[in-house]
A protein has these predicted regions:
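Conserved GNAT acetyl-CoA-binding A-motif
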Residues: 100, 107-120
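A short beta-loop-alpha structural element at the N-terminal edge
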Residues: 2-17
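Conserved acetyl-CoA-binding loop-helix of GNAT-fold acetyltransferases
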Residues: 86, 92-105, 131
């Protein structure tokens, strides 16, 4: 059975291991071989004053994580998920749906009105988020410029 809870500094070794195992594999193929760079990245996300991160556990094993932050905006309080993943061998087995529903309940109880996230439109996660009730923001685009 799954349980979820807010992550703490004591979970960072497991967070790092899970993050690498998911995002260095299909479909992402991100190169997180630089442990210092990964430590800095995760530290930036989890070290913010408004950081709010959750873990999904099966027994005592971390199998899912959501790293995000609460943002206060004119239209209400938001939770921006920066990173969300489920251990590869648990994907497609309702773990992600269970976890996201738990997160929704938790952040709603904290006054959050909207959850935001981004993903590629060419990966399975896109369909998962749509199934979970997320909609594309039609009037917003994501810009990038390599310098």
């Amino acid at each position: 059975m799954y349980t979820s809870r807010q992550l703490s500094i004591d979970d960072m070794k497991s967070v790092t291991s899970l993050f690498k195992s998911v995002f260095m594999a299909e479909p992402w193929h991100d190169d997180w071989s630089d442990d210092e760079q990964l430590s800095l990245y995760l530290g930036e996300l989890t070290g913010q004053t408004n950081s709010l991160s959750f873990g999904l556990f099966e027994e005592n094993e971390l199998i899912g994580l959501s790293i995000g932050a609460v943002k206060h905006w004119y239209s209400g309080t938001e939770y921006k998920i920066e990173e969300f993943c489920i251990k590869s061998d648990r994907q497609g087995k309702e773990a992600g749906a269970f976890f996201l529903q738990k997160i929704e309940k938790e952040v709603k109880a904290r006054g959050v009105k909207t959850i935001y996230l981004q993903t590629g439109n060419d990966v399975r996660a896109y369909e998962f988020y749509k199934k979970m009730g997320f909609e594309e923001e039609k009037n917003n685009v994501f810009f990038a410029k390599e310098i």
